[in-house]
Amino acid sequence: MTKEEINVILKRRIKNGDEFNHLIEKPKNQKVKLQTGDTFYSVSIMSVWAKTFYKQVAKLSQILKGKTIKETCDKIHYFLFYDIQYQADGVTQNIRSPANSWFNRREGIDCKSYSIFASCVLLNLGIKHYIRQIKQPNFNPKQYTHVYVVVPNNQTNGKLEDGYRVIDGTVQSNKEPNYTSKKDVFMSLKLPHIGLNCPVPKKGLKGTPSKTKRSTTTKKSSNQTRGRFPF
């Protein structure tokens, strides 16, 4: 199957999406030439890119947060599928930050960049997940040809034995495709630690972050995007 044939199958009519612009940082017009490598190198760079640029969608992540893991995954998938166009990469593999993906949403991105975007949202929400690359039985079966995100139901230990959810922005159904082989890369942020030997600052002191402003901004954004998700 050619790149053009894949694009015909996976392209969709996307929504306007402008109501999310204020929730996503603008790209800084940076282009970094990375090493040449196989798909394993691609996934390793995807992991680095997500952990480097996840704050670009910190505000959006609060809008995509659901009441459960399932609802959160459904909202992320719905956003990716209906607000960002698909476009297969050629020989050159594009590893996009979420800001770059959003800027190019009408031209399209491929499965790697959908996965980076989903991973960035999940990292902001503190949700453990994996970037999964697979071999598909009916498409170049000897090669790893697709990548997406899986989210374990068990967020305590992050293991997949208790079941998991899939986030695949390339398809409307969001069902995991058949595969003959898989490789998973675990994604979770290491939390910052601060050693203290002083009184805990009281609320209202200079330097203490204001929760009122943040909650007001989040509430305003929620009102603007209300009704965008069918659940």
Describe the residue ranges of each PLM region.
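A structural boundary/capping signal
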Residues: 1-231
